[in-house]
Amino acid sequence: MKILATMAAVLATLLYNFSADANELSDISNYREYSPTFSSSGQPTREQLQLLKDDGFERIVYIAFSNNGNAFADEDVAVKELGMDYVHIPVIWDQPTASDFYAFAGSMQREPDRKTLLHCQVNYRASAFSFLYRVLYEDVSVAEAKADMNSVWQPNETWQNLIFGILEENGKSPHCEGCSWAIDE
């Protein structure tokens, strides 16, 4: 009986630790993992930055403004204190530019194998940039990248225009079998 109780306690501990570990990153707002080295999300908390570090992330790229509602002003300091690289590319929500995207892509291309989290406030900007980056630089199909982006949101007209323009500049079509770019109003 004592052995059975000990085994149950060990099993319970293992299950607790497994479930806690499995859900930690998924607790970050709209967290999406695209590959072993690239993820996107909404704004992580200060505590979640430590989780990212513990999971092997080496670079945090932030593409919103530090004065946004749920941002914290010293994220750059917190990230650097954890030993990760920090890149800040402020993207105006209703005026994103191709230059904004290419600044992000350039930072990724300098060290493409560094484990990176791209984030904004709710993962709208970040999932759109992730879509473009994956299609243009990682040879992910439009259908797969779009399905991932649409698990977060369906881009509005402003963002759709940016996406279509950048794809066109790079000789890619936004269209794919089963893809709909209809904007939900």
Regions found by a protein language model. Name each.
Residues 18-117, 131-185:
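Cys-dependent protein tyrosine phosphatase-like superfamily
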Residues 120:
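Short cysteine clusters
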